[in-house]
Every structure is written in structure tokens, then in C-alpha cells.
């Protein structure tokens, strides 16, 4: 079954609030659409209230509380406020796991947040890949959204078949394609396309397991690296393990090796308390 057919047949799709959808669409031209994005945040009372609560939480760590979106922008900068607003809208969908498995939903959201923090660090170390920070952060947050769709599309027997193939050594993507005909990356990209998201978000979601690095590396390479880094959190980190899961040609295309991995893991490890708090608060 093709990815677009899977998305079309699932009735219980992830739901993104209208204000968040508008913010995502404005990422098409993030620099030009700054005022429009700020207007969306300010004119949505629910989003503004959630944003101020998050800004005043321990996850952000401001020295004094802010009482308005304007104050939040003054202290944090617009790009950071935009990222926080997007995370609030996206988190509501990714935290929810269909069929009652709330624990899995929280784990998926936590992994997505770790990946978003990781891609921000990686992008700062690889200036050759020209990417807008809010776009990179948001793409990383949404890279696994297709898993929510597949969890609704797959029957219990199909889920068991996917698990069986993974236990036999296949990757999750290969197992999903073998059982249903498409993997979560393809399905997630189709979902974003149905929401009329910009190509800058769809491409890295579609290719985060098969990143595009020819003729030049793009955001899918950074999200791929960040996803692999995020999976190293909580396990024995190091290049020996990392090199077995990463696309080494993609990593080489941006000069990402053992030295860069060690730096990112050390920096990200020092931020994990903040990451954990953010995942809980957003």
C-alpha cells in the first residue's frame, strides 16, 4: 500500500491546532513572515497563555517572569519564541499514542525533543548546510510523526510481523515497508503534504533515514544525524555504535565524524535536564 493511501484510510490522524498549522506554513519564508507569525501567536489566547507558562517554567530558566508575548520576544528572541510556540502545538499530537498506549506516546515525544535539541547543536557545528534554525528544530520535532499514523493503520497481526522482522535484524523502516508497503518516514511526509506544509519540512521528514547529500547535503542529513545521536542517549555512546546506524556517506558529506559526535554528545548530555523539563512542560 502506498503512503498516501495509508494516510487517506486512517480516520484517527494526529491533529495539529489551526494556529500551529499556520505557523508551520509560515516557515516557507521564515524571515519574511516574522510579523505574520508573531500575529498568529498574539491573537490566539490559548497559545499565548501556554507560551507564557512555558517561558516562565524551569525548562526555560528566565531570571524573571514575562507577562506578555512581547516580553518573551525581548528576552528570548523571536526565533526561540517561535520554536517554543511550535513545540507546544506539535507536542499535543506526538504525546498522544493511539490505542491507549500513553507511555509510548511520551517516549516518542521525548525522543523528538532530544532530536530537535541535537539538530540545533549539529547545525551550529556545520555552517556549510544553510538552514533556518526554526525549520531545523521543527523538522526534527516532527520527523517520526508517521509512526502515529502507522500505529492506527497496522492491525495487531501487522504490528507483530513488523516486530518479528525487526527482531530478525531488519531496520524498522525495512520491516514497515515489507509488511505494509511504506515506512513511517514516507507516511509522515505524506501527512505533512496533506496539511500543505512547506517542502523545507516535508523533505527532511521523508528522508531522515535515507538522507539526501547529492549534489549537496541538505536538512535531511542534519535530521538523520540528530536522530542517530538521540538514539545514543541512554546507551553506551561512541563512534563504534554510532557508525553502525548512521549513513556514513551522509555523515562524511558534512564532515561529521568521531570528534564531532563526541562534542555533540557531551554538549547534549549537559543539557539533558533542560531537555527533560522541556519535554514535560511543552
Task: Specify the residue positions occupied by each region the protein language model found.
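Terminal helices and disordered tails flanking the catalytic cores of nucleotide-processing hydrolases
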Residues: 1-5, 248-282
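Conserved alpha-helical "signature site"
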Residues: 1-246, 282
Amino acid at each position: 500500500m502506498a503512503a498516501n493511501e495509508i494516510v487517506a484510510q486512517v480516520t484517527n490522524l494526529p491533529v495539529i491546532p489551526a494556529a500551529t498549522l499556520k505557523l508551520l506554513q509560515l516557515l516557507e519564508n521564515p524571515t519574511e513572515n516574522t510579523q505574520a507569525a508573531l500575529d498568529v501567536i498574539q491573537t490566539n489566547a490559548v497559545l499565548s497563555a501556554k507560551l507564557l507558562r512555558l517561558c516562565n517554567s524551569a525548562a526555560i530558566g528566565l531570571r524573571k517572569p514575562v507577562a506578555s508575548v512581547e516580553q518573551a520576544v525581548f528576552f528570548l528572541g523571536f526565533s526561540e519564541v517561535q520554536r517554543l510556540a511550535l513545540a507546544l502545538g506539535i507536542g499535543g499530537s506526538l504525546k498522544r499514542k493511539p490505542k491507549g498506549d500513553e507511555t509510548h506516546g511520551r517516549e516518542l515525544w521525548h525522543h523528538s525533543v532530544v532530536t530537535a535539541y541535537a539538530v540545533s547543536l549539529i547545525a551550529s557545528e556545520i555552517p556549510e548546510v544553510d538552514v533556518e534554525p526554526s525549520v531545523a528544530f521543527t523538522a526534527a520535532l516532527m520527523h517520526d510523526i508517521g509512526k502515529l499514523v502507522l500505529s492506527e493503520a497496522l492491525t495487531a497481526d501487522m504490528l507483530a510481523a513488523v516486530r518479528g522482522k525487526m527482531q530478525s535484524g531488519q531496520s524498522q523502516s525495512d520491516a514497515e515497508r515489507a509488511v505494509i508497503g511504506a515506512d513511517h518516514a514516507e507516511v509522515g511526509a505524506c501527512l505533512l503534504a496533506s496539511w500543505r506544509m512547506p517542502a523545507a519540512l516535508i523533505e527532511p521528514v521523508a528522508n531522515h533515514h535515507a538522507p539526501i547529500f547529492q549534489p549537496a547535503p541538505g536538512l535531511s542529513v542534519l535530521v538523520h544525524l540528530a536522530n542517530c545521536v538521540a538514539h545514543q542517549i541512554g546507551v553506551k555512546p561512541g563512534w563504534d555504535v554510532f557508525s553502525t546506524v548512521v549513513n556514513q556517506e551522509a555523515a562524511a558529506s558534512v564532515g561529521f565524524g568521531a570528534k564531532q559526535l563526541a562534542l555533540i554528545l557531551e554538549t547534549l548530555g549537559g543539557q539533558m535536564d533542560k531537555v527533560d523539563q522541556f519535554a514535560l512542560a511543552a
